[in-house]
């Protein structure tokens, strides 16, 4: 049932930390590539809460709701009330997709830009894997180390 609400999921490997240099004390920009879908990602992570190192593998999922039945999120957190998608992951952020761009050529690429309260994500790769996202869509990012 949960797989129906997940819009994107893949296993990533951390390639580099802070590729453009360290900008913030408690935030690290993670550069990672995915195993199955050959996606590229930059993701800002609060590494004081969720530390990552080069070579770490993690599952990353994007979903519009945490409710397993697919109902929209109410915006209120009630601990222990019912099982949610968050129960299967270790690090969760909520944000808004603010930009989608596509580039044509020999190998077309699509890019998603999401802001999680100022922590940013760029997800780049084959347009077929990210064509079902919509501009201004609210998304949950869910991560779990492998």
Curated annotation (Swiss-Prot):
Keywords: Nucleus. Its main location: nucleus. InterPro entries: NA-bd_OB-fold, RPABC3. GO terms for biological process: DNA-templated transcription. It is found in: Nucleus. One of its GO terms (cellular component) is RNA polymerase II, core complex. SMART domains: RPOL8c. Pfam families: RNA_pol_Rpb8 (PF03870). The keyword Nucleus applies. Component of the RNA polymerase II and V complexes. Associates with the mediator complex. DNA-dependent RNA polymerase catalyzes the transcription of DNA into RNA using the four ribonucleoside triphosphates as substrates. Component of RNA polymerase II which synthesizes mRNA precursors and many functional non-coding RNAs. Pol II is the central component of the basal RNA polymerase II transcription machinery. It is composed of mobile elements that move relative to each other. Component of RNA polymerase V which mediates RNA-directed DNA methylation-dependent (RdDM) transcriptional gene silencing (TGS) of endogenous repeated sequences, including transposable elements. Belongs to the eukaryotic RPB8 RNA polymerase subunit family. This is DNA-directed RNA polymerases II and V subunit 8A. It comes from Arabidopsis thaliana (Mouse-ear cress). The gene is NRPB8A.
């Amino acid at each position: 049932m949960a797989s129906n609400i997940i819009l994107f999921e893949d296993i990533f490997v951390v390639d580099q930390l802070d590729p453009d240099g360290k900008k913030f004390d408690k935030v690290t920009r993670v550069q990672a590539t995915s195993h199955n879908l050959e996606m590229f990602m930059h993701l800002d992570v609060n590494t004081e809460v969720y530390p990552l190192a080069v070579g770490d593998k993690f599952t990353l999922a994007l979903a519009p709701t945490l409710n397993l039945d697919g109902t929209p999120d109410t915006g209120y957190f009630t601990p222990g009330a019912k099982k949610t998608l968050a129960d299967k992951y270790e690090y969760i952020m909520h944000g808004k997709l603010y930009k989608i761009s596509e580039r044509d050529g020999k190998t077309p690429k699509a890019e998603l830009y999401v802001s999680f309260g100022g922590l940013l994500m760029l997800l780049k790769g084959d347009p077929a894997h990210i064509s079902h996202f919509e501009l201004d869509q609210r998304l949950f990012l869910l991560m779990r180390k492998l």
